Swiss-Prot record:
Cross-referenced InterPro entries: Fungal_M35_metalloproteases, MetalloPept_cat_dom_sf, Peptidase_M35
Protein name listed in UniProt: Neutral protease 2 homolog NFIA_102630
SUPFAM superfamilies (alphabetical): Metalloproteases ('zincins'), catalytic domain
EC numbers, comma separated: 3.4.24.39
PROSITE patterns: ZINC_PROTEASE
Lineage of producing organism: Eukaryota, Fungi, Dikarya, Ascomycota, Pezizomycotina
Amino acid sequence: MKVTVLASAILALINGALALPANAPTLDVTLTQVDNTRIKATVKNIGNEEVTFVHLNFFQDAAPVKKVSLFRNATEVEFTGIKRRYLTEGLSDDALTTLAAGATFEDEFDIASTADLTEGGTVTIRTDGVVPMATDRKVSGYIPYQSNELEIEVDAAKAATVPQAIKLLDRRTKVASCSGSRASALSTALRNTVSLANAAASAASSGSSARFQEYFRTTSSSTRNAVAARFRAIANEASSQSSGKTTYYCTDPYGYCDSNTLAFCLPSSNVIANCDLYYSDLPALTRSCHAQDQATTSLHEFTHAPGVYSPGTDDFAYGYRASTALSASQALLNADNYALFANGTPPSFPSPHPLSSAQTNMV
């Protein structure tokens, strides 16, 4: 096991890049090896004040979410867990962690449960990003975090004995039939996703450079082309319910929805599933800038699916403030940047119409 201490130096760079004040809250993450692929993360509040943050998609989340990135020979190992979108207001207590200044908490997890490490060998582990800060159960800001770089030698035989967190469903056992009001709601959401994505693709390729800079931190033609291409791919994928690269469930077939989660994606299988909150708490479309709705939530999840456009996105940040503070390279691969940009590019929505041919399997 080899540990490279980079956290303090890189956190200083992150704080500078995000233009945070010197006393801004910051989390330091120390990764250590417990046994083979079992890892412990020690998260410390190195700021001067108590902080409350959303720990979904972060350490202390019990779901098989992406807590760290794994690399073998500088190539990232595919993540086989879930990426989910959650509420940004009205959060429940079980989604929040409060940490006093100088305090720590620990989280142990097995990286082999959400990645194929059966070939063994040297694996490098690290993580960085921003975690949403919460005030009165609402996302109110962001806290940057960064870990050390941990290098471990994986015993292939031991890694092969670790149960996979997600067991793929056989198509014959899908019980979540999309019918009734939920089928109607998802059909409307997909139509709206097509319109949003097409409008966003046009804005990305030939719209205001200042506005593109606002969301993606650059105006380079290569980035504008890449963003536009992803939006076009999403519009294509969402244009039908009969076939395509993704399978879209009206309800959760895996049991990972909870009182805060709107929807999630299983990128390794190009599966998307909606949760109850998608239908009960979200409007079909919002006319409020940067607010959540069904269409941009579906769009957010489509960006995660590599079958739609590769590579799929990550969840480096949530919400406008945090997402627009990312570096250009992270913004390009952050799901919420696409949802926020699309939300701020209102198209002229067509009247309801039957979905056209061939892309998304809706079940």
